[in-house]
Regions:
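Anionic-ligand binding region
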Residues: 117-120, 126-148
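Short glycine-aspartate micro-motif
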Residues: 45-47, 119-123, 193
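Glycine-rich phosphate-binding loop and adjoining helix at the ATP-binding site
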Residues: 19-34, 38, 44-45, 53-112, ...
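Short beta-strand scaffold segments in enzyme catalytic cores
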Residues: 1-6, 110, 128-134
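Short glycine-rich, Thr/Ser-proximal phosphate-binding strand/loop in the N-terminal lobe
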Residues: 1-31, 73, 137-165
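Glycine-rich phosphate-binding loops at beta-strand->alpha-helix junctions
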Residues: 54, 183, 187-216
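A short, acidic, amphipathic alpha-helical segment used as a generic capping/interface helix at domain edges
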Residues: 172-186
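Glycine-rich phosphate-binding loop plus the immediately following alpha-helix
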Residues: 81-108, 137-175
Length: 253
């Protein structure tokens, strides 16, 4: 998805969406993002939400893209292409603009947290994303959803979209509630935010206290806050032009 935002977070273009093609190599992803950007009006800087772990702009892990298709085993050739790939520099070269890239849950979290104590953001989509903030600062990204869930499954797989289709709505909801409890036991957050495309499939009345469902559009709106909340641990800016006060756009991932 992509849009252009004003400095105060107002969308000044329609959201454009493209399905992720598989197999998705770095070159394929860059081309898809270029095509998304071409649908948008002029912009001054770029924020990208990526479905994997990013350290210093480089890919540390990306469960989704190292598989030929969702649900298939990892492909060693795709793992080799993605591990250590300097995505941030590649994006800066592609767009010729200042760029920040971070995990997509980190980006969404930047838009929804209050900056009070320990805050945990969980995104439910193709897989499961996680972001942790303390007093408004984004902590180094951790793939908490890689933890085990029952026999032979990770939390990311058990609560992901493929399994939702296999097991049905009620079983999927039970799994998600179990996973949320496990995350809370590990992180001890003061508040838990739940976003992503499948968050709407939960009943907010069943969530209990200190849990909030947030709109999926916050994944785009977080593109602005990403520049304010991130440090060197997860994302660092690469500038090819002078940075301006204009909105970071497009945001995609």
């Amino acid at each position: 998805k992509a849009t252009v935002l004003s400095p105060d977070g107002e969308m000044i273009s329609e959201r454009e969406r493209r399905e992720t093609p598989y197999p998705c190599t770095p070159d394929v992803l860059l081309e898809e993002l270029r095509l998304l950007a071409a649908t948008q009006p002029a912009y001054d800087r770029v924020s990208v939400g990526f479905p994997g772990a990013i350290r210093q702009g480089r890919v540390r892990d990306v469960t989704a893209f190292v598989r030929p298709a969702p649900g298939e085993p990892r492909d060693p050739k795709l793992v080799e292409q993605w591990f250590g790939f300097d995505l941030q520099s590649a994006l800066a070269d592609a767009f010729g603009k200042p760029v920040r890239v971070a995990n997509d849950a980190d980006v969404q979290g930047c838009a929804v947290i209050k900056g009070e104590g320990m805050e945990l953001v969980i995104t439910l989509g193709t897989g499961v994303g996680c972001a942790v903030f303390y007093d408004g600062a984004l902590l180094p990204h951790m793939e908490l959803s890689h933890g085990r869930f029952g026999e032979g499954l990770s939390i990311e797989v058990a609560c992901g979209d493929n399994e939702r289709h296999k097991v049905g709505k009620q079983e999927w909801r039970k799994r998600v509630h179990s996973a949320l409890k496990a995350f809370e036991d590990m992180v001890l957050p003061d508040h838990l935010y739940i976003g992503g495309g499948n968050a709407k499939r939960l009943e907010e009345s069943e969530l209990g206290p200190n849990r909030t469902i947030v709109p999926n559009v916050s994944g785009l709106l977080g593109g602005i806050a990403l520049w304010e909340r991130t440090g060197d641990a997860n994302a660092s800016p690469i500038a090819h032009d002078h940075d301006t006060e204009s909105a970071p756009a497009p945001a995609g991932g």
